[in-house]
Amino acid sequence: MRLGIKEIQEIIPHRHPFLLIDFIDELEPGVRAVGYKSITFNEPQFNGHFPGQPVMPGVLMIEALAQVGAVAILSLPENKGKTAFFGSINNAKFKQMVLPGDRLKLECEIIKRKGPIGVGKAVATNAEGKIAVSAELTLSLIHI
């Protein structure tokens, strides 16, 4: 199932400039999602990270992965209207710099769910298939 920006915004509350997914290419509600993010020089973080040598901040790559995980878990009918918040970020590993012009494939598989908590195994790869970042993300689902 493919989701564009409009469908993504119906599931998660993030908006510009903090919506870090361009589209979802694969979705199994409650199980996994695969999304993509094209990195462009015009993004606001590159004004200061780093002037003359722009590099995508690792925390924003983690956030993009969490947004994909949130789409996966919040796409379940019983989670409609909830928001996913970080519970924890474990075993984060940053392996490749991500630069303007790169395209990230963002994958998150929900490996455990218990009540309002979901744990996702998340990996972002570049166009060459090299892992840029991986982490285990715990998301807490809350009505706000």
Question: Across the structure, where does each feature detected by a protein language model lie?
Answer:
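Catalytic strand-loop segment that frames the active site of acyl-thioester-processing enzymes
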Residues: 16-56
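Short beta-strand edge segments in extracellular beta-sheet folds
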Residues: 138-140
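Hydrophobic beta-sheet segments that form the core/acyl-binding groove
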Residues: 24, 90-127
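Conserved small/polar residues in nucleotide/adenosyl-binding loops
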Residues: 142-144
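Beta-strand-rich interaction surfaces with strong enrichment in secreted/lumenal proteins
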Residues: 9, 52, 94-96
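Hydrophobic beta-strand-centered segment that forms part of the acyl-chain substrate-binding groove
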Residues: 1-2, 69-105, 132, 136
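Short aromatic-glycine motifs in intrinsically disordered, low-complexity regions
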Residues: 5-15
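Active-site helix/loop of acyl-thioester processing domains in fatty-acid/polyketide metabolism
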Residues: 24, 56-79
